[in-house]
Regions:
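Generic protein-terminus/edge-of-domain signal
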Residues: 1-61, 65-67
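A hydrophobic/aromatic-rich effector-binding and dimerization subdomain
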Residues: 16, 20, 88-152
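Short aromatic/basic micro-patch
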Residues: 44, 76, 100
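Residues immediately flanking
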Residues: 55, 79, 101-103
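Basic/polar, acidic-poor N-terminal "presequence/leader" segments
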Residues: 61, 81-86, 91-92
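Short acidic-glycine-tyrosine-enriched beta hairpin
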Residues: 64-78
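Histidine-centered metal-chelating micro-motifs
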Residues: 75, 80-86, 106
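Polybasic "coupling" helices that flank or enter modular domains
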Residues: 156-157
Length: 157
């Protein structure tokens, strides 16, 4: 039987891949910088995760079906969801970017009240969000800007 990784924090995920945590509630990840990788993992998400898959480096089982994704698409998971990943490359670093955030980040916000309405966080939708090249560039720019903000630490007011 394989171990289930209960992801209750972004720090847990970062430690599994040897990535740095700059903020306990949100993390921009670059799996090209991973120092560890798992050939197989069963994830139980307690956080939100959006991955921009720049290559197809693993097979993903989501709920009871395979997740349909390809290079250049976004794969999304929400708290309470399970996914299994099986690596299909022998490299530690894979070409994927993403953002992980704890549900507490959304407390008291309008997004926190409406995020469950977004169908890309639903088991019924087992297909990744397909993006144009321009949309991929926008996502990568946004992740870069968020990462820069995280590197500056907490503002003192």
């Amino acid at each position: 039987m394989n171990k289930i990784f209960n992801l209750g924090s972004v720090d847990q995920y970062n430690k599994l891949y040897g990535l740095e945590t700059l903020n306990p509630l949100v993390s921009v990840i670059n799996l090209n910088k991973a120092t560890r990788q798992m050939n197989y993992a069963h994830w139980h998400y307690g956080i939100y995760a959006l991955y921009l898959k720049l290559e197809k480096a693993c097979d993903i089982r989501y709920g009871r079906q395979n997740y349909d994704y390809q290079e250049g698409t976004i794969v999304c998971f929400a708290p309470g969801q399970d996914a299994e990943t099986t690596l299909i490359t022998d490299r530690v670093q894979v070409n994927a970017l993403g953002i992980l955030f704890h549900p507490d980040l959304l407390l008291g916000t309008s997004l926190g009240k409406t995020i469950k309405k977004y169908t890309f966080f639903s088991y019924e939708v087992n297909e990744a969000l397909h993006l144009s090249e321009e949309e991929r560039n926008i996502i990568m720019d946004c992740l870069r800007i968020i990462r820069l903000e995280l590197e500056h630490g907490v503002d003192k007011h």
